[in-house]
Each structure stands twice: as C-alpha cells, then as structure tokens.
Amino acid sequence: MSLKNLIIIFFLCVVPLINAQQNNNKSNVIIGDNFRLHPSNVSQTEVFIVTHPSNPDIIFSSCNTIIFNPFFVSEGVYVTTNGGNSWYGSDTCKGAPITLHGGDPGITINKDGTFILTRIGFSSGLYSHYSIDNGMTWSNQKTITNDDLERATMTSDVHPSSPYFGRSYAAWVKFAPPFPLNFAVTDDSGDSWSVPAQINNPIQRSSGGDITMGPDGKVYVCWAGVTSVSPFTEDFVGVAFTTNGGSNWQVTENAFDMNGINGLLTQKGNIRVNGLPNIAIDTTGGPRHGWIYIVTTQKNLAPAGSDPDIILNRSTDGGQSWSAGIRVNQDPLNNEKIQYFPAIHVDKTGGLNLIFYDDRNTTSDSSGVFLARSEDGGNNWQEFEISDKNYKPVPIGGLGQGYQGDNISITSSNGKLWPVWMDNRTGDYQIWTVPIELSSVYVDETTGQVTEFRLEQNYPNPFNPSTKIKFTIPYVNASEAKQSELVTLKVYDVLGTEVVTLLNEKKSAGIYEVEFDARQLPSGIYFYQLRTESFTNTKKMVLLK
C-alpha cells in the first residue's frame, strides 16, 4: 500500500479522536483517565502521596479535609494496595482523639511498611499517628511538640546500607523568631519522638521547609528565606544536610537566589499562591545518583520571565554548589501564561518528573495540570497536559484570604507516575489523579546513553507559524556508536502529498531537533514522518492560523 493511502487511512481514523490523542498519546508516556481518589462532598486540599518502599502496589495519599457544618478539619487517608486499580479510605483520619485533629498532614511509609502521619492540632502543636494495617486503623495521637508551627514534611530512611536504616524524620518551620527550621526523629515507627531540635539560625525568616532522603543515610532539607514585610516574598533558598542522623547539620542559609510569587494571584480569582521550594534526590544508583533537585516558582529573575515560571536548580556535588536556574516550562517567555505549585519526583529510572498548574491551553482565569519530564537531569524537557478538564480556581470561603490549598504532589510505582492535585470541576475541591505509564523509558541507567529510536510530539501543537520536532537516534553498542545512518524527516498534508523535506542526511547517535516553519501553508492537519534504515514513525500536528 502506498504511503499516500496509508496516511489517508490514518487521517480518517484519527480525526474523530484528535482531542483524545492530544491528551492521552504523548511521546513516551501513556496518560490514563482522570479520577478522584475518594469522591465526596468534603473539600480536599494540599495533597501528598508516597509509595511503599518494598511493595510498589501500596500507595498512600493524604490531604486536608474540611467540613463546614459543623466546622471540622481532618486528614484524608486514601490508599491502594493493588497498584492503583482501586482505592479505599476516608476523609477522616481515625486516630484518637478525632475531634482534636487540625489537618496539614505530612506522610511517609517506613521500611516496615508502617504509615506515619503528622498533623497540626485543634490547639498549637505537632502530633502524629501511625498505622500498621495500610491505613485501616490508626494509633492514638503522639505529641511531637506544642510549638506553633507551619506544617511538617516527612521522609524515611529505607536504604538497608544506611546506619540509620528505619529512622523517620519530620521537619517544620517554628512560628517564633527567628523562624527556624526544626526537626524530630522516630526510630520506632512513630510510637515515640526525639526532642525537637533547631536546624538553622536564619537572618531572614524561614518558610516552607521540605525534607528528603539522600544516599548513605544523608538527609536533606530546604526552605525559603523570605522578605521581612508582607507579602513575605521568597528571596532565596536555604539548604542543609546531615550525615549522622540529625546530630549535626551543615547549613547554607542562601544556597541560591530566587524571586518567588507569594501572595494573591489576581488572574485566578485571587487565590493564595507561593513559590516555596520542593526537593528531590536521585538515589537510583544510575549516572546521576546523588544529584539533588530543587524546584520553585519564580518571576522577574532570569531565567523566569515576567509571568510565574517553574524554575529548577540542581546540585551534582551533594549540595556544595548549585547550578543556575533552569526554566522547566517550555512555553514562550513573557507570554502572560502562568505556572505555579510545582511538585517534583525522581522515579526508579532516574527520570525527573514535575507537575504544576498551567494555563497555556486555556483562558487566564482557568488552569490545567501539566507534567514536565526530563531523562537527562533537567537539560531537556518533554511536557504533557495531564488534566482532561480545566477548572477555574477560586478561594474556599471561610478559610483565610485566598485559600484553595498550597501544594500538590507526585510519586511513582510499577513503571507509572501517580500525580495528585486539587481542582473544583465537580463544584467542591477534590483530589484528582491520573495514572501515567512510562511506556518506553529509553535511557540506559549505566551509561546514560539513549537506547531506542524516538520521534517526539512536536511543540507547540497546535502551532503558528513554526514548531519544533525532536527525534532520537540510539546508540547500538560501543563499536557502532559513531556510525551514522541516513535519516529523512518529511511533512505531508492530509492527502498524503509531500509538503516539505526537513531533513535528508546521515546522522550519528544522539538527540536532534528540527524547526518546521509553516508560514506559507494554510491551516490544517499535517503529518511528519521520520524514516531511517531501521525505523519509521509518523505523527500528526495541527497548524492554526
């Protein structure tokens, strides 16, 4: 059958499914359907999600849950034990005393599979509960501190080679001068806690502490140093780490500068937003083992533009030095499009995954959710819209100026990403997710070399007047790595007529990008085909003028 006939048949098949393909068949990931973890009429916000360290079928998520009549705040408990096929749980953590719960959960699963949850209370303080039956029942409350504080975040040492294997950590900002980061540890699955200790002694108040495990028992924390007057804009990022289980910390109060977005976002119904840092570390044993990544939301400080952008900084030497900022979102700079609330996760292959709210494909009063994925430590990014419906952010009445939640989250399990976020498409803010299958992770963990042919989806798409097409020629083996082969990249219209040849030359192994300028062509659907001696793939793109 001729190429022309094949393309015509392909066109007839795909035209009715254009929207579905744009949402669900994206490059090297397969995006499923959006669904709620625990459908209810309760407001659900500020979600976290973690995976069991030795049983990837078990995933645990928690969030703020708010009931208004009578007014009650608790922590949702949402669990799957079958890899995400089904979820169970409750909008109320059942650890006594239930009436004294106050939300703001921090969660972890330790080496024994014990769920540990920290929360604030009806009065000042930080409290914890644990579950040894996958969230079905919970312990009575354990008091960690009676201080007034910002929510705690948690991590657990699940690396058997670590001298602190099994220890779990909680970190938070204390709401008293000088507003330092504090922490406590538990060695018995949350049954008892160490006396809280101070990590840093900031000149400018700390905000938004985050914590994660590195290799060899190292623990890393980060926070934002904020300005001294409202709106307390994030001014720089501080980082600290301990190599001895928290006995001592090496502190860098200003690891790198930032310019955050703390305040109200007028374009989104005056919701409250922030630029607080989120940290992740590669512990895969691959080529970027030990790399540390911190993501923030910034504007008016390069590489961020005049609109809020997602910015990544990384350290390849254990936090001793930090890269310049890397702009993650790939939409045009200063285009009046807004990205905010990023969450970061390194999967088992060393892939770097970020989710964030983004309005590039909708109106300025609405938002969708995007995934950005890098398989080379943040040098190059692929982006995918993962929400199948946009929503209009609005504050939740009665919960403080502009409140609709302050963070989202992401984890991975069994070759799938599990992002979680809140949106109000059903009328109430609810926690949503979507399984994202990493269908063909193509970077060799040992060599860091590309091992599969790839033809990426063009970006932007739809486009006007130009778009970029990225493709990959793999390394076959060491003896053939320098060999080249003939590569053609051609564009066809819907009738199968060749429009232009973008490339017709020999290429060696590597990642390439070609720009297609369509200013002389009419609007419509086009197809681009990559052909080599051993690989052929065709994708569609839409020109809208």
Residue map of PLM features:
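Asparagine-centered polar/low-complexity signal
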Residues: N5, N28, N34, N313, ...
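Sec-dependent N-terminal signal peptides
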Residues: N5-V15
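Short, proline-centered helix/strand-breaking motifs
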Residues: V15, P53-P56, P460, A478
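Extracellular, repeat-based ectodomains that mediate carbohydrate processing or recognition
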Residues: Q21-S440
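Low-complexity, Pro/Thr/Ser/Gly/Ala-rich linker/spacer regions in secreted
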Residues: E437-Q449
